[in-house]
From Swiss-Prot:
Ranges of Basic and acidic residues composition bias in the record: 127-137
Family classification: Belongs to the RbfA family.
Key words of the record: Cytoplasm, Ribosome biogenesis
Protein's UniProt name: Ribosome-binding factor A
Gene: rbfA
UniProt GO MF annotations: ribosomal small subunit binding
Keyword Lipid biosynthesis appears in the UniProt entry: no
SUPFAM superfamilies: Ribosome-binding factor A, RbfA (SSF89919)
Assembly information from the UniProt record: Monomer. Binds 30S ribosomal subunits, but not 50S ribosomal subunits or 70S ribosomes.
Amino acid sequence: MKPLRKERLQQAIKQELSKILLEDMNDERLKFVTITDVELSDDQKYLKVYFSTMPGKNSEQILQSLERVKGYVSGEVARTLRLRFAPEIKFELDNSIERGVRMVKLLEDLEKKDEVKEDESHEDESTDHTEETNEEP
């Protein structure tokens, strides 16, 4: 399959999956799922679906729910997009967003520590300067 066609097809699959999970599923847990990426095999028989969920939601339960409906979802994707095969879906939790949030927080904490150190060093310099001017020759 040509790379451009594959990319467009993957994008269409991603949109269709999101729509199916939001509109067709009765399981409320699946309403909190965001499809972050999909990878379709060249023969279109296998589809790896990466998803994330809101913090505080039980990702293991959500994964189990996704596993229960993957046959239906696969068939709907194939029917809607007129695929030759209904791809075998494998869902994988995508923690990259959570990792990114943690990294940003760590960087912010480091920045705050650096600011505190700079403030302390400026205070030390001003104290040293004041002491020097108060000395008698």
